[in-house]
């Protein structure tokens, strides 16, 4: 079996199968200026079948991004504003009595959609957060005695405002670990902001067109898992994750007292999956070290627990990941 020929064939196949990525990107660029990192991560989440936790101040096109993506693939979109008085039933649905039928009927909640924007997830109590996170994990919801499967594709993008912390309920570490990525989004640059301004003044506001069907995304996910991961790349992934747990073994002794707990095995799996999806988006049939480095921060930043000492010295998980990537030998 000639591996070289196999990889060449796989590469050609991926190039064919991933052509829709350009169509989606083109459509989304009509309505969203800048925010390339966020849009790319949304696509990775969609293709790797994982959910995204987004951190950024209000007004950075988070709602518009996921709504536009849903429209381009003809999927159902639902926005849930999390508030302190929200109940799990407001999210999942409930049994209501129908006088006409003289029986209880199911009224499904907003979680029954392909794309969910869970806005300011840290504003709702733990009971509501865990109801959403359970739906994310199980891909099904139980109302009364009946269990209902959620539609595929199913992507949750939860947002957190990094500034307002009053009246918030921080997500527990175990819950945060369920997110494939935590993406931190920044302000647009000056040129992008001018374009946003012009776009709002222009009366001919552009809208996205539907260029794909949900089933095509489901099919693409199977292809993403076929993207080739060499053993050297697997070793590179495990070394990066293990360095968050045992920094001293990787010449990172200075972080021994800074890290309270390292990334879980889920991080290893997700690092591989996101790298495969990233390679797919770049129209490549194999993963290279640069793919791992490109997604490492998003996959690991919410999975490293810092000690009080790290916080006192203003050491962030980003600093630790940067140091790990600079220290671990690239294959």
Q: Which residues are covered by each model-predicted region?
A:
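C-terminal engagement/docking regions of AAA+ P-loop ATPases
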Residues: 1-9, 14-15, 247-331
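Conserved C-terminal "switch" segment of AAA+ ATPases
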Residues: 13-18, 31, 168, 182-255, ...
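Pre-Walker A (pre-P-loop) alpha-helix and adjacent loop at the N terminus of AAA/AAA+ ATPase modules
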Residues: 14-60, 242
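Conserved alpha-helical scaffold flanking the Walker A/P-loop in AAA+ ATPase domains
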Residues: 41-44, 97-117
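Walker A/P-loop
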Residues: 46-83
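Conserved AAA+/SF3 P-loop NTPase catalytic/coupling segment centered on the Walker-B
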Residues: 89, 110-137, 151, 166-175, ...
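AAA+/SF3 P-loop NTPase mechanochemical coupling elements
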Residues: 105-114, 143-160, 171-180
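A short beta-strand-to-loop transition that corresponds to the Sensor-1 phosphate-sensing loop
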Residues: 120, 154, 158-163, 185-188, ...
């Amino acid at each position: 079996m000639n591996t070289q020929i196999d990889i060449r064939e796989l590469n050609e196949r991926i190039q064919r199968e991933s052509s829709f990525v350009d169509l989606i990107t083109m459509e989304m660029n009509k309505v969203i200026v800048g925010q390339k990192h966020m849009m790319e991560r949304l696509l990775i989440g969609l293709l790797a079948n994982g959910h995204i936790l987004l951190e950024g101040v209000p007004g950075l096109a988070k709602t518009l991004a996921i709504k536009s993506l849903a429209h381009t693939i003809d999927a159902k979109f639902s926005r849930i504003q999390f508030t302190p008085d929200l109940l799990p039933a407001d999210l999942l649905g409930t049994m209501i009595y129908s006088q006409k039928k003289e029986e209880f009927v199911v009224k499904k909640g907003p979680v029954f959609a392909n794309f969910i924007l869970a806005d300011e997830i840290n504003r709702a109590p733990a009971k509501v957060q865990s109801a959403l996170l359970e739906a994310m994990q199980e891909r099904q919801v139980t109302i009364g005695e009946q269990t209902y499967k959620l539609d595929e594709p199913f992507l949750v993008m939860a947002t957190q405002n990094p500034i307002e912390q009053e009246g918030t309920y921080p997500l527990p570490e175990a819950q945060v670990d369920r997110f494939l990525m935590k993406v931190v989004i920044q302000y647009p640059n000056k040129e992008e902001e001018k374009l946003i301004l012009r776009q709002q003044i222009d009366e001919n506001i552009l809208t996205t067109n539907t260029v794909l069907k949900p089933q095509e995304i489901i099919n693409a996910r199977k292809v993403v898992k076929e993207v080739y991961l060499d053993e050297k790349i697997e070793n590179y992934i495990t070394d990066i994750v293990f360095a968050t747990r045992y920094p001293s073994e990787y010449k990172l002794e200075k972080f021994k007292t800074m890290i309270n707990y390292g990334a879980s095995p889920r991080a290893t799996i997700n690092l591989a999956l996101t790298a495969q999806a990233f390679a797919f988006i770049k129209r490549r049939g194999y993963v290279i070290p640069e793919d791992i480095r490109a997604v490492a921060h998003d996959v690991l930043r919410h999975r490293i627990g810092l000690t009080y000492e790290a916080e006192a010295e203003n050491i962030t998980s980003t600093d630790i990941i940067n140091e790990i990537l600079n220290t671990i030998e690239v294959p």
